[in-house]
Amino acid sequence: MASIIFSAKDIFEQEFGREVRGYNKVEVDEFLDDVIKDYETYAALVKSLRQEIADLKEELTRKPKPSPVQAEPLEAAITSSMTNFDILKRLNRLEKEVFGKQILDNSDF
């Protein structure tokens, strides 16, 4: 991971040599002020994210690890729902068979 070369204070205290045809000092200072604000914002964001990572890691260590026993009720529920679905399909076929014949018998009148 790359290390940070400049801090906000380093940027603020940086001095530049002066030449006759140099940059506008006020513009450079304003730009560097904005860069300092960005550095401070990024530093605060990094600190906040590191704290959040630490909190989440701590929360993860406090939670109990899931055991294989917990998977069994889920498998039972899936099997049960498949069984219920099969029963409903069978009931549907039987109803069609019974009520379908009644409809055909009633249409003969």
Curated annotation (Swiss-Prot):
Keywords: Cell cycle, Cell division, Cell shape, Coiled coil, Cytoplasm
Chain coiled-coil ranges: 36-63
Identification of the protein by name: Cell cycle protein GpsB
HAMAP family: GpsB
Source domain of life: Bacteria
A single Gene Ontology CC term: cytoplasm
Species assigned in the record: Streptococcus pneumoniae (strain ATCC BAA-255 / R6)
Subcellular location: Cytoplasm
Short name of one Pfam family: DivIVA
Organism phylogeny: Bacteria, Bacillati, Bacillota, Bacilli, Lactobacillales
Gene: gpsB
Subunit structure, as described in the record: Forms polymers through the coiled coil domains. Interacts with PBP1, MreC and EzrA.
The keyword Cell division belongs to this UniProt entry's keyword annotation: yes
InterPro entries in the record: Cell_cycle_GpsB (IPR011229), DivIVA_domain (IPR019933), DivIVA_fam (IPR007793)
